[in-house]
UniProtKB/Swiss-Prot annotation:
Pathway note: Protein modification; protein lipoylation via endogenous pathway; protein N(6)-(lipoyl)lysine from octanoyl-[acyl-carrier-protein]: step 2/2
Binding site for [4Fe-4S] cluster 2: 173, 177, 180
Cited HAMAP family: Lipoyl_synth (MF_00206)
Presequence extent in this chain: 1-33
Cofactors that this protein relies on: [4Fe-4S] cluster
Organism lineage string: Eukaryota, Fungi, Dikarya, Ascomycota, Pezizomycotina
The organism's place on the tree of life at top rank: Eukaryota
Compartment(s) where it occurs, according to its Swiss-Prot or TrEMBL record: Mitochondrion
GO molecular function (one): 4 iron, 4 sulfur cluster binding
Catalysed conversion reaction: [[Fe-S] cluster scaffold protein carrying a second [4Fe-4S](2+) cluster] + N(6)-octanoyl-L-lysyl-[protein] + 2 oxidized [2Fe-2S]-[ferredoxin] + 2 S-adenosyl-L-methionine + 4 H(+) = [[Fe-S] cluster scaffold protein] + N(6)-[(R)-dihydrolipoyl]-L-lysyl-[protein] + 4 Fe(3+) + 2 hydrogen sulfide + 2 5'-deoxyadenosine + 2 L-methionine + 2 reduced [2Fe-2S]-[ferredoxin]
The species this protein was found in: Talaromyces marneffei (strain ATCC 18224 / CBS 334.59 / QM 7333)
Protein name from the UniProt record: Lipoyl synthase, mitochondrial
Binding site for [4Fe-4S] cluster 1: 142, 147, 153, 388
A Gene Ontology cellular-component term: mitochondrion
Amino acid sequence: MAASSTRLRCLYASSSTWKTSPSQSLISLSRRYATTSSAPPTPSDESSSTLPKRRKTTTFKDKLNAGPSFADFVSGNGDSNNAPLDASEAYALETVMIPGPAGRGKKEHTRLPSWLKTPIPDSTNYKRIKKDLRGLKLNTVCEEARCPNISDCWGGSDKSAATATIMLMGDSCTRGCRFCSVKTLRTPGPLDPHEPENTAEALSRWGLGYVVLTSVDRDDLSDGGAHHFAETVIKIKQKAPGILVECLTGDFAGDFDMVALVAKSGLDVYAHNVETVEALTPHVRDRRATFQQSLRVLEAAKRAKPSLITKTSMMLGFGETEDQMWDALRQLRASNVDVVTFGQYMRPTKRHMAVHEYVTPDKFELWRQRALEMGFLYVASGPLVRSSYKAGEAFIENVLKKRRGVGNTPGAEVTTEVPVDALAK
């Protein structure tokens, strides 16, 4: 027992000695084995705070490292860096690094090109329209889809050329397209039976020259909302006979009888958007929507009323190729579509598809010219163009008035592909 206690005392004594002077022992060992080429000893906790912190790399330093060396710069071997940018490089996505959430460093942010920036809406006409919409419990796709042209369409001084896009059947859609900011629900609420009357009342107050009626998709309804659409058109024509009405509908799940019902309701233009080229449709639109079904909807509207103007819209910037664009336009012309519009896809939120490319104004103009050469009746093309953007101005000045012979001299030739009486109903 005595030997055992002696052993314990020895162990305790040695450990006590180690605890009292660990730094001295480490220093002693490091000095014993140190050489001139060895790495410096690991500093203790007390001394680490006195060492200078490593400076973070900067954006400027990264750019400098990516560029030519100093020798190349002086000798002029880096002349290729001074060559003028071609169009594709000049309009490439411009990115900057901005501070992210606390503790998460910086993140990449894409800047909008100057041609996509619009003023904040703030005018008397804009405020009045918004107040009426709230009072009558109406929705607009202008607000729900965060359209960049809302100040231009609602706040213009010329009411006769102004355009409003009323969204019927609620603000919740049964489909979920990857580009659209309208919220999605499997079973939205019931239709408002007063909506057709309220819509007609609002439009008669505003004195607009052109209105676009659109809607969320309502796959939960047996008719897809077609009767609601038709009733709204009839009410508008009763209260404001002079107003031009465009209906931008869904595909009614392929029920072409419902397409015909809306086409014969008294509207002036039947619109249904293909949104993108056929190859990208499965990635952009809800799986229940297909490019071919959209073509059949437009064909069904034309069959129901051959004199009707049919219209569609495409967004650019998803990554579509020229061959895919040509193919889409050829199929649209084969379906006798009269009007097509091109606009830039703008990502509404982070959960939606990212923008693949900001298409330049020059390229939009090129596609406008190409579409006109293919025989489309009218083409609106530009970064901020939307399906209903300045639709009244476009149709009144470029299609409807021309068809009615407004401003033509006696004996002048008047285009009559679409009968006047069909447009005046």
